[in-house]
Regions:
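Cell-envelope/extracellular polymer assembly enzymes that use nucleotide-activated donors
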Residues: 3-7, 32
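Short beta-strand/turn micro-motifs composed of small residues
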Residues: 8-10, 37
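Short, well-formed alpha-helical segments that are part of the catalytic scaffolds
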Residues: 12-25
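Acidic donor-binding segment of Leloir-type glycosyltransferases
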Residues: 24-61
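Acidic donor-binding/catalytic loop of UDP-sugar-dependent glycosyltransferases
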Residues: 42-43, 94-99
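Glycine-rich, basic loop-to-helix element that forms the pyrophosphate-binding segment
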Residues: 63-82
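Short beta-strand-to-loop acidic/aromatic patch adjacent to the donor-nucleotide binding site
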Residues: 84-95
């Protein structure tokens, strides 16, 4: 098992591809990315599927939207998807600096 989980709570696709592109460009891929879809009406899974062969990525769609009323609750349920020792909580519009 990898030690680092990159947790990305997601709702809008606007910047998600750029976020995942920045992660894919890293020299080391010793991490697993978890995408927690907050019951988005947008096709986030289509974006995520593009990265399946680039690094370890796990997509989970939640049926209930929590972001509007309990954003920290949505973050927590996304974190609970992972089992890694370390976590890094990203937003779906964050960029990872190149290593």
């Amino acid at each position: 098992m990898k030690k680092l989980a990159i947790i990305i709570p997601a709702y809008k696709p606007r910047f998600l591809q750029e976020t995942l592109d920045s992660i894919a460009k890293q020299n080391s891929h010793e991490f697993t990315v978890y995408i927690g879809d907050d019951a988005s009406p947008y096709p986030l899974k289509t974006i995520v599927d593009h990265y399946k062969n680039k690094f370890d990525i796990i997509y989970h769609r939640f049926e209930q939207n929590m972001g509007k009323k309990d954003l920290p609750g949505h973050w927590e349920r996304c974190i609970l998807l992972s089992e890694e020792e370390l976590i890094c909580l990203f937003s779906d519009d964050d960029l990872m600096p190149f290593d």
